[in-house]
Amino acid sequence: MKDFIMPRTFPCPRCGQPSVWEGNESRPFCSERCKLIDLGAWASEEYKLKTQDAPTSGKGQHSDDYED
C-alpha cells in the first residue's frame, strides 16, 4: 500500500488562505489575483516601514541642498 503524502501548504501572505507550494506559479501567493493585488499595494505605497525621522537643522532634506 502506498503512503499518500500531503502536499505542503502555507498561508497566502495576501488573503491568508492555504496554498499549495509545489506547482504553484503564483507562489508565495495562492493565486495570480492575490499576486497582482499585492503588487498594486506596493505600487501605491501601502506598505511602509516605520522610521524615526532625524531632527532637521532647518536646511532642506535633499543632498542637493547642502553646500560642498
From Swiss-Prot:
Cofactors that this protein relies on: Zn(2+)
Listed A to Z, the keywords are: Metal-binding, Zinc
Spell out the Pfam families in the cross-references.
YacG
**What top-level branch of life does the organism fall under?**
Bacteria
Biological-process GO terms, alphabetical: regulation of DNA-templated transcription
Q: Disordered: where is this region?
A: 48-68
Q: Which GO terms describe its molecular function?
A: DNA topoisomerase type II (double strand cut, ATP-hydrolyzing) inhibitor activity; zinc ion binding
Looking up SUPFAM superfamilies in the UniProt record yields: Glucocorticoid receptor-like (DNA-binding domain)
> Which residues are listed for Zn(2+) binding in this entry?
C12, C15, C30, C34
Cofactor: how and how many bound: Binds 1 zinc ion.
According to the record's subunit comment, the protein's assembly and interactions are: Interacts with GyrB.
| Name recorded for this polypeptide | DNA gyrase inhibitor YacG
Q: Which organism is it from?
A: Acinetobacter baylyi (strain ATCC 33305 / BD413 / ADP1)
